[in-house]
Amino acid sequence: MAFREDKCLLIVIESIVWVMKVCGKANPHHPIFINIRGNNHFIPFTHKVSSDMKDLKSYSLLPHNTFGIDAKCRRFVEYNTVEEAQDVVRSLKDDDYPLLILGGGSNLLLTGDYAGTVLHSGISFIEDLGNERVRCGSGYVWDDFVDYCVRHNLYGAENLSIIPGECGASAVQNIGAYGAEAKDLIEEVEAVEIATGKVCHFANADCEYSYRQSKFKHEWRDKFLITSVTYKLSKTYEPRLDYGNIRAALAERGIDNPTATELRQVITDIRNAKLPDPKRIGNAGSFFMNPIVSKDKYLELAAQYEGMPHYTIDDDHEKIPAGWMIDQCGWRGKALGNAGVYEKQALVLVNLGGATGSDVVHLCETIQHDVKEKFGIEIHPEVNVR
């Protein structure tokens, strides 16, 4: 009877210790010893990964990066619920590190095999919360979210149509296109803290969003598993038509006042016309961020290059298209080995077949050097190079 009582007591204590560690009241990496009736009992903080999760060793990441780089990782884990994400981080051991948190792989360049654990979200759902708020699992396809919004008369995301990737990445990269950014829609981000397993909720302001940047990309990099994102849309449709060649494309179709559905289709067609299909040509979309320069620097360059495209940020800053500068350096359609610059859009670097991540990095650095030499401007990758 004493043995059974001790066993039950031990189970209760283990549960209490587990709660303490989840709540941050005990170190999740330190084991605990409990003495019951003179016997020491070891309570580790190690949890087995749920049986329905994907947990693979020496796994090829070829299906998980649109650049088409055939790199392997030591361990690959895909979780499908918040609870599974918590189980994963609680089960991590020292030899599971370093970690790579992977979304759709559409903004990733792998420079070689990854000697650590890749964590991928399989949390895929969409939920209408009412009051123009929509919540999506981090593994939900971004363009499916945009399509849902347009079909349900929820506005603000239509200019972000057909951007590849998943909703979790929108909160990390602050994805943007045609005058719109994810930060304009994001209300709250839910994430599991890797160090503790705690579920955290971050308001938009907490994430410190700026052009293609967030705290998840820097200070919080590899510290959280994003599990869902809540977006705030609008019932009022206010089309943004003055970025890129949207108006020209609408005029070709005889459309003056497009519906959200028409605008989404036009933007989809524009992007498909100038960006390669990663199923045919490996790429990660726009490789470089468009640099923001001072007004004085812009005026200096505008005097040298008539008709130089630009977008006003504020009274003191202008954005200059990196693709235009790369084109001016003569790189469009050119290649270095098996890595090249897409012939229809100089902002896109491509895998011409058999390129390694190092091949793409070499091309990237060569282009950066040439742009700096010609324009005196540094351009930086938008793509996550790992």
Spans of features found by a protein language model:
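Extreme N-terminal basic, low-complexity initiation segments
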Residues: 2-12
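Anion-binding (especially nucleotide phosphate/pyrophosphate-binding) glycine-rich loop
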Residues: 54-195
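Phosphate/pyrophosphate- and phosphate-bearing ligand-binding catalytic cores of soluble enzymes
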Residues: 56-57, 62-66, 108, 199-358, ...
